[in-house]
Amino acid sequence: MKAFYGILIIFILISMIDLSKQVFINAKCRGSPECLPKCKEAIGKAAGKCMNGKCKCYP
């Protein structure tokens, strides 16, 4: 059971590190397809989505 909790803590830490790589850009959007060219221009990779009217890009 201790091993389970240890592995769970490791997964939580890894997911926190991975999620911190996202970048919010100051570009308004109404849908995720609008963010793809804006993310490509901002960070060089067309990977992102629209959240709360702003583009969120993933490097």
Curated annotation (Swiss-Prot):
Tissue specificity: Expressed by the venom gland.
Signal peptide (from-to): 1-22
InterPro entries (UniProt xref): Scorpion_toxin-like_sf (IPR036574), Scorpion_toxinS_K_inh (IPR001947)
Site (Basic residue of the functional dyad): K49
Subcellular location: Secreted
Pfam families noted in UniProt: Toxin_2 (PF00451)
Keywords: Disulfide bond, Ion channel impairing toxin, Neurotoxin, Potassium channel impairing toxin, Secreted, Signal, Toxin, Voltage-gated potassium channel impairing toxin
Site residues (Aromatic residue of the functional dyad), renumbered to this chain: Y58
Keyword Disulfide bond annotated: yes
Disulfide pairings: C29-C50, C35-C55, C39-C57
Outcome recorded upon mutating K49 to A/E/R: Significant loss of affinity for squid Kv1A channel
GO MF term list: ion channel inhibitor activity; potassium channel regulator activity; toxin activity
Gene3D superfamilies to which the protein is assigned, alphabetical: Knottin, scorpion toxin-like (3.30.30.10)
GO CC terms: extracellular region
Annotated region described as Interaction with Ca(2+)-activated K(+) channels, given as residue ranges: 48-55
Additional notes on this entry: Negative results: inhibits with low efficiency Kv1.5/KCNA5, Kv2.1/KCNB1, Kv7.1/KCNQ1 and ERG/KCNH2. Does not inhibit Kv1.4/KCNA4, Kv3.1/KCNC1, Kv7.2/KCNQ2 and ERG1/Kv11.1/KCNH2.
Domain notes: Has the structural arrangement of an alpha-helix connected to a beta-sheet by disulfide bonds (CSalpha/beta).
Family from the record: Belongs to the short scorpion toxin superfamily. Potassium channel inhibitor family. Alpha-KTx 04 subfamily.
Function field: Potently blocks Kv1.1/KCNA1 (85%), Kv1.2/KCNA2 (91%), Kv1.3/KCNA3 (89%), Kv1.6/KCNA6 (94%), and Shaker (97%).
Protein's recorded name: Potassium channel toxin alpha-KTx 4.1
Species assigned in the record: Tityus serrulatus
